[in-house]
């Protein structure tokens, strides 16, 4: 298909200015102003034969369809604010410019007297090698890519339940006299860079994205 490009295709430098700008915008790296982060890793610094030595054509990144803020290509680990525990995405000029809170408390308090029904934890997943695609097939996810002689890692921001039963009766705040309840992780599909044979391509893969409460009414037995 049009989104498939051989993994051996050279990362050419003769692209138009517009194409280069789009590629740069799509893969802008997260950098810290205090310069504590190292410089981008060069492909030649990687071990021979590693996945990072697979060269990906920049043309793959010219199409911006269906991009999710939960997928990040970066030479640096995504920053996590220690104070507010917020996760920052790429500072792009489009919908990627946003924050997602990483709820890490045992039972996070939103406002005084307000609690979450379920407890969730959000993390950046850096080494996802396989995933289920939208057709139900197991596919190989590219962890590292070589683009213009820089090594980028593909990160996924995933949210899942910390515990299926935050309280002994199930979900927090549910009337256990009338309802059975439990917390469960739900999923969505995001566009990720995968490989099949010698082809790199975009596929929709399933990742964890939320923790929700499932309830069912207790049926009374009248004998």
Curated annotation (Swiss-Prot):
Residues 10-21 have a biased composition (Polar residues). Disulfide bonds join 118-183, 161-211, 171-213. Pfam families: NGF. Expressed by the venom gland. Gene3D superfamilies: Cystine-knot cytokines. Residues 1-104 form a propeptide. Glycans are attached at residue 127. It is found in: Secreted. This is Venom nerve growth factor 1. Homodimer; non-covalently linked. Residues 1-45 are annotated as: Disordered. InterPro entries: Cystine-knot_cytokine, Nerve_growth_factor-like, Nerve_growth_factor-rel, Nerve_growth_factor_bsu, Nerve_growth_factor_CS, Venom_nerve_growth_factor. Keywords: Cleavage on pair of basic residues, Disulfide bond, Glycoprotein, Growth factor, Lipid-binding, Metalloenzyme inhibitor, Metalloprotease inhibitor, Protease inhibitor, Secreted, Toxin. Nerve growth factor is important for the development and maintenance of the sympathetic and sensory nervous systems. It stimulates division and differentiation of sympathetic and embryonic sensory neurons as well as basal forebrain cholinergic neurons in the brain. Its relevance in the snake venom is not clear. However, it has been shown to inhibit metalloproteinase-dependent proteolysis of platelet glycoprotein Ib alpha, suggesting a metalloproteinase inhibition to prevent metalloprotease autodigestion and/or protection against prey proteases. GO terms for cellular component: axon; dendrite; extracellular space; synaptic vesicle. GO terms for molecular function: growth factor activity; lipid binding; metalloendopeptidase inhibitor activity; nerve growth factor receptor binding; toxin activity. Residues 22-34 have a biased composition (Basic and acidic residues). GO terms for biological process: cell surface receptor protein tyrosine kinase signaling pathway; modulation of chemical synaptic transmission; negative regulation of neuron apoptotic process; nerve development; nerve growth factor signaling pathway; neuron projection morphogenesis. Coiled coil: none annotated. Belongs to the NGF-beta family. It comes from Azemiops feae.
């Amino acid at each position: 298909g049009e989104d498939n490009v051989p993994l051996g295709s050279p990362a050419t430098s003769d692209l138009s200015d517009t194409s280069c700008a789009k590629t740069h915008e799509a893969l802008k790296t997260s950098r810290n102003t205090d310069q504590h982060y190292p410089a981008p890793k060069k492909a030649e610094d990687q071990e021979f034969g590693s996945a990072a030595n697979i060269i990906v054509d920049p043309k793959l990144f010219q199409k911006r369809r269906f991009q999710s803020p939960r997928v990040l290509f970066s030479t640096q680990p995504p920053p996590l604010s220690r104070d507010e525990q917020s996760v920052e995405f790429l500072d792009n000029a489009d919908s990627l410019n946003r924050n997602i809170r990483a709820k890490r408390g045992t039972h996070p308090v939103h406002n005084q007297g307000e609690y979450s029904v379920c407890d969730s934890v959000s993390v950046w997943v850096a080494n996802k090698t396989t995933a289920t695609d939208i057709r139900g097939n197991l596919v190989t996810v590219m962890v590292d890519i070589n683009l213009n002689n820089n090594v980028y890692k593909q990160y996924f921001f995933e949210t899942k339940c910390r515990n299926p039963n935050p309280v002994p009766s199930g979900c927090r705040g549910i009337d256990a006299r009338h309802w059975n309840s439990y917390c469960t992780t739900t999923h969505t599909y995001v566009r990720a860079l995968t490989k099949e044979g010698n082809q790199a391509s975009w596929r929709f893969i399933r990742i964890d994205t939320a923790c929700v409460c499932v309830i069912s009414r207790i049926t009374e037995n009248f004998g």
